[in-house]
């Protein structure tokens, strides 16, 4: 049976994985090419038995592909898992999209469980968004002047590239899974191309609730309900969503260490808001840090991936740094789509009527994302006679697919089985 190794590290061991200055310097000098980033991705994928020794797997064929969608800077990077015996033809498709600034390699703990016994009916695609991961990094040149124009143009950058990729693969309809910002963009894709999405699985999606701090500069102006929320928030501001993403450890999210209570924080400092509005991303700061970059990032990675065994941790750290270091591209979408603090400039909640397919919301029980908004969206969809479900995954944070792959996989596999039963009944 293919497995991914799991180990629990002590706090002392976890701290030992922060890099020395010498290690940081060496990695900085090495991590400056697309080939290095792909090599690091291979090292992550090869921690999975059936991928590392794919020739021995009797069922699944693993292909790493760069699909050309545009003439210039238009390669979309993917891992496809299909059936060795029958190939890809006449199969249904399930497509997994990663979150902001990440890459398809983040799904490495899910690839075995999500594809074993599935390839006879489904081709599984793990895809890097254009401008992220190991896909091409075209210039991100948004010409819109108003916030609304920037949102629309930025959303089209992602949805049109995904649609062009779909057409190139001859996929008629797909189950679409998206995490965080990838969930937001997947939802927008489903709104723009409803006939192409069979089901929508949103994994801790950003941009669901209204922005209580919205102003006339944003794509939508806050209403009276959101306005009242401002006062509630300002009475006792919660820990910043963005801050939580940096500070939460994997021990906390997986239940191996008690969660620290959130401490009230003031709204984001003005200089952070200024940097956000100027599209200064975390990755641009990482690039500017030069030889210190890998060491600085190791403070984050040693916390975020703190329960993984040493070799897996190192592979994932190297992978993250290698793709973060590549030329900036669609990472600059952040400030166009989200206001400072990670609220949407144009939220999904106010566009739910455009969704036409069964929609699943998933959150970790220690998620910093607003799962209550996901529950409200679920209820609103049901009121519109759209099938919807809301799931909380135990012992997991924002990256619930990574923290608790077994429970996450089971929810996805349930939806796959339901689709197969529905398809069989229609065929009969």
From Swiss-Prot:
Q: Gene3D superfamilies recorded for this chain? A: alpha/beta hydrolase
Q: Coordinates of motif HXXXXD motif in the sequence?
A: 398-403
Membrane-topology annotation of the record: Peripheral membrane protein
The residue numbers the entry assigns to motif GXSXG lipase motif are 178-182
| InterPro entries listed in its UniProt record | AB_hydrolase_1 (IPR000073), AB_hydrolase_fold (IPR029058)
Listed under GO biological process in this entry are:
cardiolipin acyl-chain remodeling; lipid homeostasis; phosphatidic acid biosynthetic process
Instruction: Give the catalytic activity.
Output: a cardiolipin + H2O = 1'-[1,2-diacyl-sn-glycero-3-phospho],3'-[1-acyl-sn-glycero-3-phospho]-glycerol + a fatty acid + H(+)
Q: Which UniProt keywords apply?
A: Hydrolase, Membrane, Mitochondrion, Mitochondrion inner membrane, Transit peptide
- GO molecular function list: carboxylic ester hydrolase activity; lysophosphatidic acid acyltransferase activity; phospholipase A2 activity
Q: Which family does it belong to?
A: Belongs to the peptidase S33 family. ABHD4/ABHD5 subfamily.
PANTHER family for the chain: PUMMELIG, ISOFORM A (PTHR42886:SF29), RE40534P-RELATED (PTHR42886)
The protein's name in its UniProt record: Probable cardiolipin-specific deacylase 1, mitochondrial
Name the species this protein comes from.
Answer: Schizosaccharomyces pombe (strain 972 / ATCC 24843)
Q: What is the lineage of its organism?
A: Eukaryota, Fungi, Dikarya, Ascomycota, Taphrinomycotina
């Amino acid at each position: 049976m293919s497995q991914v190794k799991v180990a629990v590290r002590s706090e002392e061991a976890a701290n030992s994985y922060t890099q020395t200055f010498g290690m940081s310097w060496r990695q900085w000098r090495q991590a400056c090419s697309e080939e290095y980033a792909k090599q690091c991705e291979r090292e992550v994928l090869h921690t999975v038995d059936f991928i590392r020794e794919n020739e021995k797997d009797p069922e699944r064929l693993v292909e790493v592909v760069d699909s050309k969608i545009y003439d210039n800077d238009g390669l979309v990077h993917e891992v496809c898992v299909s059936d060795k015996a029958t190939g890809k033809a006449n199969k249904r498709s399930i497509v997994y999209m990663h979150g902001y600034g990440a890459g398809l390699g983040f799904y490495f703990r899910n690839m075995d469980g999500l594809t074993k016994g599935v390839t006879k009916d489904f081709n599984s695609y793990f895809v890097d968004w254009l401008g992220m991961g190991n896909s091409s990094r075209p210039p991100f040149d948004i010409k819109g002047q108003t916030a609304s124009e920037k949102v629309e143009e930025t959303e089209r950058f992602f949805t049109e590239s995904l649609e062009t990729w779909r057409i190139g693969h001859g996929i008629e309809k797909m189950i679409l899974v998206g995490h965080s910002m990838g969930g937001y963009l997947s939802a927008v894709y489903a709104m723009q191309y409803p006939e192409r999405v069979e089901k929508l699985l949103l994994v801790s999606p950003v941009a669901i609730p209204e922005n209580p701090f919205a102003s006339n500069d944003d794509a939508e102006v806050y209403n009276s309900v959101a306005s009242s929320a401002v006062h509630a928030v300002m009475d006792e501001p919660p820990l910043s969503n963005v801050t939580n993403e940096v500070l939460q450890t994997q021990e906390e999210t997986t239940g191996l260490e008690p969660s620290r209570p959130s401490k009230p924080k003031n709204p984001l400092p003005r200089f952070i808001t200024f940097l956000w509005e100027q599209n200064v991303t975390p990755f641009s700061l990482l690039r500017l840090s030069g030889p210190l970059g890998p060491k600085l990032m190791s403070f984050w990675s040693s916390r975020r991936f703190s329960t993984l065994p040493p070799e897996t941790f190192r592979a994932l750290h190297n992978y993250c740094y290698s793709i973060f270091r590549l030329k900036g591209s669609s990472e600059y979408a952040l400030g166009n789509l989200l206001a400072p603090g990670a609220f949407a400039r144009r939220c999904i909640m106010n566009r739910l009527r455009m969704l036409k397919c069964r929609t699943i919301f998933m959150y970790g029980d220690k998620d910093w994302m607003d799962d209550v908004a996901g529950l409200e969206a679920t209820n609103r969809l049901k009121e519109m006679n759209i099938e919807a479900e809301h799931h909380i995954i135990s012992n997991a944070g924002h990256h619930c697919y990574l923290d608790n792959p077994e429970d996450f996989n089971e929810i996805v596999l349930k939806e796959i089985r339901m689709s197969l039963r529905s398809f069989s009944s229609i065929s009969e």
